[in-house]
Amino acid sequence: MAFIHLDVGFLYTLLVCTAFGSMLSNAEIKVNPPQDFEIVDPGYLGYLSLQWQPPLFPDNFKECTIEYELKYRNIDSENWKTIITKNLHYKDGFDLNKGIEAKINTLLPAQCTNGSEVRSSWAETTYWTSPQGNRETKIQDMDCVYYNWQYLVCSWKPGMGVHFDTNYQLFYWYEGLDHSAECTDYIKVNGKNMGCRFPYLESSDYKDFYICVNGSSESQPIRPSYFIFQLQNIVKPMPPDYLSLTVKNSEEINLKWNMPKGPIPAKCFIYEIEFTEDGTTWVTTTVENEIQITRTSNESQKLCFLVRSKVNIYCSDDGIWSEWSDEQCWKGDIWKETLVFFLIPFAFVSIFVLVITCLLLYKQRALLKTIFHTKKEVFSHQDTFC
């Protein structure tokens, strides 16, 4: 028994010493942060490259495959984006209206340390575009609409208090273009560039679309404005057309319309229907181009509806409602309205003809009476001479 007790005690001591030795060994292992960490702007209007070089390693760790933990954000953001990578660079889009900060450390995996993972200290860097011009000189009310998923149009207003000689230029870039491009079809107001009609944009969907609008003036520097869009989220479709309203029976009504023309697939639409029954209006939505509704009263005399469309959540995160379609209506008791429509003018004309006839008859009677009275006087004179 004493031998067994001694053996267990020895094993316990050995385990404690091994664990302590391993902890001591790991505590002594240190790894350096990556070198030459920087943010590089290749001129893509906000699509930046974060890049670095491997840290300096002791010879016994050179065969280890290390990873890097990268964190970055715009300076006014509360949340960091975190990336774990084995590469020496990472690219992402940023709002260049604000500053950017990033930090990175080295992760030495557990298999290289015979223990737990080892992290280096952080290497940090920041990036700002070169500031120029007062904030008030930036354009205002930038508005971009991707009409029918085919034609992109952007418009803006001039900055506050800018000199009359100020003019603006728009540049854009998205992944697939070799370099940023300038607008070739400006919308002009009083000779100044206040918008842009873009050319056909090939393969531009579901990726960041970067825009910069800067300006020039001989009187003052103009601060540029930067924007990032996802084009599928600013699509404004055409309104639906060929609406039909069918009253099936005393209660059921069928509303139907054609999907908007253009390249947008049928599965990508959601429709908003505004239905009016005798002055009472309600609104509903559907992803189909047909809907059945129930009349609130089978004695309702007028039913009307109109429809508009938008790209739904299956094809985009957001969208812009189209204009409303033309209104389509149904009216009950149409024979009564038809009779009233024709009866009133007919009655008016009949009364008018009757009055004219009476006047003519009265005039004719008066004329005959005058002629008869004249003839009677002539005959009286002839009797006297005889």
UniProtKB/Swiss-Prot annotation:
Q: Which cysteines are joined by disulfide bonds?
A: 64-112, 144-154, 183-196, 268-315
Q: Which Pfam families match?
A: IL6Ra-bind
Q: Does the keyword Glycoprotein apply?
A: yes
Q: What GO CC terms are in its UniProt record?
A: external side of plasma membrane; receptor complex
Q: How does it sit in the membrane?
A: Single-pass type I membrane protein
Please list the tissues where expression of this protein has been recorded.
Expressed in kidney, placenta, liver, skeletal muscle and thymus. Expression was not seen in whole blood and heart.
Q: Does the keyword Membrane apply?
A: yes
Changes after translation: Cleaved by MMP8 leading to a soluble form that is also able to interact with IL13.
GO BP field: cytokine-mediated signaling pathway; positive regulation of cell population proliferation
Task: Tell me the domain comment.
Answer: The WSXWS motif appears to be necessary for proper protein folding and thereby efficient intracellular transport and cell-surface receptor binding. The cytoplasmic domain functions as an inhibitor of IL-4 or IL-13-dependent activation of the Jak-Stat pathway.
Protein name (Swiss-Prot/TrEMBL): Interleukin-13 receptor subunit alpha-2
